[in-house]
UniProtKB/Swiss-Prot annotation:
This protein's name: Heat-inducible transcription repressor HrcA
Source species of the chain: Bifidobacterium longum subsp. infantis (strain ATCC 15697 / DSM 20088 / JCM 1222 / NCTC 11817 / S12)
UniProt KW Repressor keyword: yes
Keywords from the UniProt entry: Repressor, Stress response, Transcription, Transcription regulation
SUPFAM superfamilies listed in its UniProt record: GAF domain-like (SSF55781), Winged helix' DNA-binding domain (SSF46785)
Function text: Negative regulator of class I heat shock genes (grpE-dnaK-dnaJ and groELS operons). Prevents heat-shock induction of these operons.
GO MF annotation: an example: DNA binding
This protein's record includes keyword Repressor: yes
Length: 372
């Protein structure tokens, strides 16, 4: 579809349907939009759009509604993501700035995003696979068991039991802990595992070799365990108020499959468009429960300058598309923020809200306010 007028007609149909959730006719388009052509010409354009698969007519006497293909073209080519207003950004700042820990910030973010969009909001904790080690402590808890407390650069605290054949002296365990902290801080958990195995094989650590091997195994296990990522969800009650989602059972079943949901949104947040968000519509997700839903997702994570806001505005919304793309490229996503709603969701508003909350969490991590 290359005709510019037809693109304008498609955008008008999608925007009107999102607003009214009623089939859109040529008469209302002529009345409500300055398209510069007659109602008959618009009817012809709508018929052509229907033939091309962008619109569908649910009843012969009704107007048209967008198809999945129509929504996709709208999101990719026609939707304009406008940065949030200063008042909206300060509202987000006011609500989220009171966070006292990473967990608190993630829970607040999910609630806030749900309230802004009127849809289900999903926020995940930073992936342990992409985190780096900040500190590890090993504490004997039984004759042959230690508890390893692992703190990452993102503030995640993970605990893992270490089973060994015999318990070394506490001084030897502490010496091993100090060496691991000296050599592994700033390394990924998988790299830390390699380093710990090297320490275990070196002279002077024979008495704690079993402990070191168990700790290395724990690091590797945590790095590979997708279930270790925590998911915070808010706003499922909004689904009951959506007129288009009449059969909610499959959708609720899909929301219960947290590992599947996290994989879907994680992949989506890494395939962002120029606006810094990823959008999946209906059948694109290959998940039966989400057939009539859309998902908007954006990654958040480590950032140098990109996540550091100017002044007292931690949301730091970009003003232009080029600024957004530059900031997105500078940020390494380690978790995601997402919104789930009907296919007739307000894409532009949802994309802006998801992007803003993701940028706040990036700034939150960059400022180091993550200690639980």
């Amino acid at each position: 579809m290359t005709q510019s007028r037809r693109m304008l007609v498609l955008r008008a149909v999608v925007e009107d349907y999102i607003r009214s959730q009623e089939p859109v006719g040529s008469t209302s388009l002529t009345r409500d939009h300055d398209l510069g052509v007659s109602s008959a010409t618009i009817r012809n354009d709508m018929a052509a759009l229907e033939d091309e698969g962008y619109l569908i007519q649910p009843h012969t006497s009704a107007g048209r509604v967008p198809t999945e293909k129509g929504y996709r073209y709208f999101v990719d080519r026609l939707a304009t993501v406008v940065p949030l207003s200063e008042a909206q950004r300060r509202g987000i700042n006011s609500f989220l700035s009171g966070s006292v820990s990473l967990k608190d910030a993630l829970q607040r973010s999910a609630r806030l995003l749900s309230e802004i969009t009127g849809q289900v909001a999903v926020v995940t904790s930073p992936s342990l696979a992409k985190a780096t080690l900040r500190h590890v402590e090993m504490v004997p808890v039984a004759m042959t068991t230690l508890l390893a407390v692992v703190i990452t650069d993102t503030g995640r605290v993970a605990q893992h039991g270490l089973t060994i054949a015999s318990m070394p002296a506490v001084d030897e365990i502490n010496r091993l802990s100090n060496t691991v902290n000296e050599q592994c801080v700033g390394l990924s958990l998988s790299k830390s595992a390699e380093t710990v195995r090297s320490i275990a094989a070196s002279a002077g650590y024979e008495s704690v070799r079993g402990v070191a091997d168990a700790l290395a195994d724990a690091f590797e296990s945590m790095a590979l365990d997708e279930r270790a990522n925590e998911l915070y969800m808010s706003g499922t009650s909004h689904l009951a108020h959506s007129r288009s989602l009449t059969d909610l059972a499959p959708l609720f079943d899909a929301l219960e499959e947290q590992v599947v949901l996290m994989k879907l949104m994680s992949n989506l947040s890494e395939e962002t468009n120029a606006s810094g968000v990823g959008v999946a519509i209906g059948s694109e997700m290959h998940t039966p429960g989400l057939l009539h839903a859309s998902v908007v997702s954006s990654g958040y994570g480590r950032s140098g300058e990109a996540g550091e806001p100017a002044g007292n505005d931690p949301v730091g919304e970009p003003e232009t598309e080029s600024e957004t793309e530059s900031q997105t490229n500078d940020m390494e996503p380690i978790a995601f923020v997402g919104s789930i709603g009907p296919t007739h969701m307000d894409y532009a508003a949802t994309m802006a809200a998801v992007r803003a909350v993701a940028r706040y969490l990036t700034a939150f991590l960059s400022e180091g306010r993550t200690q639980d």
